[in-house]
From Swiss-Prot:
Species for this entry: Mesocricetus auratus
Quaternary structure note: Homodimer.
Subcellular location: Cytoplasm
Signal peptide (UniProt feature, chain positions): none
Protein name: Glutathione S-transferase
Length: 218
């Protein structure tokens, strides 16, 4: 029986989850909710179901796998990863994954805060100014390794791919000084399951943020 992934009909916090489901060849179906247009941004499609799904902490995204009903995007990623041995093999690797998971979320939220801000045009130059330092940290951590935890891919690579790709869309030249990060993105996109998914009709990554965002909300 396929698992169900529920989220808005955007890229958002579900992109890394979709990629991991595809990579692990997990049978899944999506429940996509549509948000209304400005000025009200009607969310009734989701709100009408929010408290009827048996979720402990109702939110989007959610994953339902039989009796397991999970919210929080990183909890969903970890759940899928545990089933496929993608959570690191040593304590040192697991420590690194914990750090990277939270670092990636920080970077994601920092970009989102700028893109949802009414002062977007004012805040964007300041964010771009600090972006090389952010990318440098990821580049130095990755070094010459294929994946962020070493030679074997883990769930964190899906998170970091998503975050780096968002920034590549936001600032197309932001990775030019970091060839190992560009190689990482190409390596990830070259994985057969990922490549096949990206060529399929199921794949959509155009709209990153919800409709109330100033940047990339269409």
């Amino acid at each position: 029986m396929p698992v169900t992934l529920g989220y808005w009909d955007i890229r958002g916090l579900a992109h890394a989850i979709r990629l991991l489901l595809e990579y692990t060849d997990t049978s899944y179906e999506e429940k996509k909710y549509t948000m209304g247009d400005a000025p009200n941004f009607d969310r009734s499609q989701w709100l009408n179901e929010k408290f009827k799904l048996g979720l402990d902490f109702p939110n989007l995204p959610y994953l339902i796998d039989g009796s397991h009903k999970i919210t929080q995007s990183n909890a969903i990623l970890r759940y899928i990863a545990r089933k496929h041995d993608l959570c690191g093999e040593t304590e040192e690797e697991r420590i690194q994954l914990d750090i990277l998971e939270n670092q990636a979320m920080d970077t994601r939220m920092q970009l989102a805060m700028v893109c949802y801000s009414p002062d977007f045009e004012k805040r964007k130059p300041e964010y771009l100014e600090g972006l090389p330092e952010k990318m440098k940290l990821y580049s130095e951590f990755l070094g010459k390794r294929s994946w962020f935890a070493g030679d074997k891919i883990t769930y964190v690579d899906f998170l970091i791919y998503d975050v780096l790709d968002q920034h590549r869309i936001f600032a197309p030249k932001c990775l030019d000084a970091f060839p190992n990060l560009k190689d990482f993105l190409a390596r990830f996109e070259g994985l057969k399951k990922i490549s096949d998914y990206m060529k399929s009709s199921r794949f959509s990554c155009k709209q990153i943020f919800a409709k109330m965002a100033v940047w990339n909300s269409k």
